[in-house]
Amino acid sequence: MTADPLDYSGKRVLVVGGSSGIGNGIAHGFRARGADVHVWGTRPSASDYENEEGSDLTGLGYSQVDVGSSDAIASASAPFDGLDVLVHSQGAVLYRRQEFEPEGFNKVVAVNLASVMQISMRFHDALAAAGGSIIVVSSVGAFRSTIGNPAYAASKAGAVSLVRTLGQAWATTGIRVNGIAPSLVDTKMTKITMDSEERRERALEKIPMRRFGTVEEMAGVALFLASPLASYMCGQTLIVDGGLTL
């Protein structure tokens, strides 16, 4: 019998930003298929997410790490003695034109781009030893203008470019680097759209499939990218947007 390529039993997975939203869905996707999963989040303990919509830390290891701080990343404890899959699902966005100011711009870029590089470097050797995989969750905002959010758009475009560059640079070490670019998924980060019927309808009109994506669908793509099914994929970012960017 052929082994199940989506069986992650015994695999060690770290999901940065896995305490809520897409990252949380990805974390549970790997856990459901046998992986040992640890997540990094922003709150002091896992109990601080109890009863929080879009957050379920059942069965997941947890650490508080402020990925906007290079010192916090450098001093954070490694969750396992090795690592098979590193998922970057950290994200920040600021509204009311805060990203047009240096402080706001730099804050968003630190989380969405700089931390991706630093954390990937931090776990490079462990991933290389395991022949592991890095998955970077960016956004379709990387490929189109995002009015009012210059830092978000620029940082996500940078993340897509980083996937290509690290994919090429680290392929010979046995690490595969790929990414996912979702469109609108109903999470905490998209509440400004989801909580407004007018904005929701306007957004749906632009999506050929006429619905929003789900965290489970993003998890499915992550499971594919980290699996032997994608063993020859390197440096690619898959757009998962219901046809929005067509």
Question: Can you describe what each PLM-predicted range is?
Answer:
Residues 171, 176, 233-235:
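Short, small/polar-rich loop/turn modules that mediate ligand/substrate recognition or access, typified
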Residues 117, 211-240, 245:
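C-terminal substrate-recognition "lid" of short-chain dehydrogenase/reductases
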Residues 120, 155, 163:
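Active-site helix of classical SDR
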Residues 139:
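Residue(s) in the substrate-gating loop at a strand-loop-helix junction
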Residues 145-153, 165:
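Active-site loop-to-helix junction immediately N-terminal to the catalytic Tyr of the SDR YXXXK motif
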Residues 19-20:
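Conserved glycine-rich cofactor-binding loop
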Residues 96-109, 203:
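Substrate-binding pocket helix/loop in short-chain dehydrogenase/reductase
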